[in-house]
Structures are given as structure tokens and as C-alpha cells.
UniProtKB/Swiss-Prot annotation:
Protein name: Myoglobin
Primary location: cytoplasm
Key words of the record: Cytoplasm, Heme, Iron, Metal-binding, Muscle protein, Oxidoreductase, Oxygen transport, Transport
Superkingdom of origin organism: Eukaryota
Similarity section: Belongs to the globin family.
List of residues binding nitrite: 60
Keyword Heme among UniProt keywords: yes
GO BP, sorted A to Z: removal of superoxide radicals
Lineage, broadest ranks: Eukaryota, Metazoa, Chordata, Craniata, Vertebrata
Amino acid sequence: MADFDMVLKCWGPMEADHATHGSLVLTRLFTEHPETLKLFPKFAGIAHGDLAGDAGVSAHGATVLNKLGDLLKARGAHAALLKPLSSSHATKHKIPIINFKLIAEVIGKVMEEKAGLDAAGQTALRNVMAIIITDMEADYKELGFTE
């Protein structure tokens, strides 16, 4: 899985500070795609300018990057890791698949800026995220969740 390896080569800086980078990912997601903020009711009362410094946003961002790191390290053998994530996001949180595509774009930009992910790495990340998101989509369908 060359694409996974290429992305993992730049994962170290992201992993070194999940909270800071995760906060940056979520804050940028909410800025570039404001409609996504409504999917996070626990952040509803936070002023847009305060999102970046909010401990809850930072903690959730850290969780996102931690889970993504686990999926990357599985190098495609991620079904056991992905199933519970798909299940909670489909049945409990009701997150449409398109939102994973949006956050994947943002993660790519943040990795470019903070971890030196070059053009080839960006392509590898898009390929990896396409695999993960396609597998999530299959899980969603299995669970009967359609957007």
C-alpha cells in the first residue's frame, strides 16, 4: 500500500500534536464549509472567532486525527477499526458521507502546511481517503443509512 506509506511519512508532525492540528482541521472545516458546524451541536453556542481556542473543539479534533492515524497505520486492513466509526456516525450522529470528503480535503491542506505533504503526498492522501470513505459508505448502506 504505497499510498498509505507515503501519507504516513508525513504523519509524524500531525501525530506529535493531535490537539493543535485537530483544532486547526475542525476550525478550517467550519470556516470553509459553515454548513458542517450544524452537525456538531455541542459547538453551536461557540462564537466563530472562539472556535480555534475552544477546548472541546481541540479535543474533538484530536480524536479525529487519532482515529485517522489508526486507520492510516492499518494500511487498508481497517474494517475492524472502521465498522464502529461508521456505525456511530451513521446511526447516532447521522453524518452524511459528503462531510468526510470535505474534512479529507481540509486535512490534506493542513498536512501540506504543517507536515510538508507534497503534491504526490496529496494525491496519495486523496487515494487513501477515497478507500476509507468508500468503505464507510458501504457500511452506511449496510446499516440502512442513506443521505
